[in-house]
Amino acid sequence: MSKSTTDNPAADQNSEAAVSKTSKPRATARKTASTTTPAKPRRSPVRKTTASNSQSTAAKSKTSTSSSVSQEKNMSQNTVRRVAIIGGNRIPFARSNGAYFNASNMDMFTATLNGLVERYQLQGQRLGEVVAGAVLKHSRDFNMTRECVLNTQLAPETPAFDLQQACGTGLQAAFLVANKIALGQIEVGIAGGVDTTSDAPIAFGDGLRKALLELNIAKTAAARLKALTKINIKDLLDAPKNGEPRTGLSMGEHQAITALEWGISREAQDELAASSHQKMAQAYDEGFFDDLITPFMGLDKDNNLRPDSTAEKLAKLRPAFGKGEAATMTAGNSTPLTDGASAVLLASEEWAKANGHEVLAYISFYETAAVDFVNKKEGLLMAPAYAVPRMLNRAGLTLQDFDFYEIHEAFASQVLSTLKAWEDPNFCKNRLGLDMPLGSIDRSKLNVKGSSLAAGHPFAATGGRILATAAKLINQKGTGRALISICAAGGQGVTAIIEK
């Protein structure tokens, strides 16, 4: 076990912390035992008592000694270890109904896993867990992650399961794997996500579904005929919709409202979008993604990328969301529907050292949040604005204490709305309960290798892409800290701090 210990992170029901010893400000900001990481390693009182009992009973009987040793081993799981990011892999992201038109979720995630297995020599190894998910799934995607594992050279004994939290799926998968590693339940695992809108499931009307189920259980010809008579042509017209069930509005329509509320200009959105494309194009030219991407189906880079993008060119596009002259959101400053997959290899420090792998960074804190976008009319994609300050408070950090900011660019206006909220005294006081604004960030540290506006956004795959990118950035710098923020459907937000 690692020497690094802390109080049980489950004490805060809304957040978790995988311990890191690199955030020096935390010790001075610590208010209660459950708010942040202790400055020095500390043994759990339960574990210490167990060790004492084990010694005192050793002279009495071998049976009690064995029992105490076993209990000591079990109690060692209360020791929280640092969680290392070893590396990541993804396939190039592709615009919907294009290069990956004939690829399924399983095809894409299997290819991503195979690339990760090859890069880190995981052939034949039994990992502790593989956790991944997809937002859009067919019924044939039952047990998808496990089936993908069985398609790879990982040992068949590697367990796997699916999860889903909309656009936060990939990062949330990393949290689950990290928790198991931190608690000593596993040594190594993979977290990831995949999505395709090219191969989206098409649902029929509920009337047709019920008629077909009735037809399936019918025992006589008369019963079958009765079931068939219940089929109505209108039940064949229920096309897939990209909207919130509670409001009927799409993400773009929701964000158009938020952009208007925060006064986000068209020019600022286009500038952010153009910058994302330009920075990602430069990153490709520099070879930054060479060890983060596995070519797939003829692509070796994201085909949404527009290296020649400029704010002037984007300004010529017509608005796609919003109404009238106030509409500012276009196809150019919004992410397109995208297909792709990503995965990240996480491990304990001990496993990394034993297997000869360099640690890129450590996951130290993470937080999830949700807003009431139905009754309180909060912005659908503004939950990260709430998650980040809670996470900063536990970490004993300020918004300015970061070398990199990796903020998911679902829409340029979403990023800008969030940043503006953190600078706004009224929002920070009335919504966040803070005495003063969080303040502004150094924009030169924002999405320095480009982000979703350039790469695209396969919903569940975005978290893995961002986590792997941030970890590599920190490792290249040698030391540092990155803030990760991802908004998600349903009024949710998933955020993390990684450092080295």
Regions found by a protein language model. Give the residues of each.
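Intrinsically disordered, polybasic Lys/Arg-rich low-complexity tracts
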Residues: 1-73
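Condensing-enzyme catalytic core mediating Claisen C-C bond formation in acyl metabolism
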Residues: 72-103, 227-234, 240, 315-386, ...
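N-terminal extracellular/periplasmic Venus flytrap/periplasmic-binding protein-like
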Residues: 90-91, 101-111, 119, 231, ...
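Active-site pocket-shaping loop/turn-to-helix segments
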Residues: 91-114, 118, 137, 161-175, ...
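Conserved beta-ketoacyl condensing-enzyme motif
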Residues: 101-189, 193-216, 287, 293-303, ...
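Conserved catalytic cysteine-centered active-site region
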Residues: 134-189, 232, 246-250, 308-336, ...
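Active-site-proximal alpha-helical scaffold in enzymes
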Residues: 165-195, 203, 259-288, 343-351, ...
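Flexible glycine-/small-residue-enriched beta->alpha junction loops
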Residues: 188-257
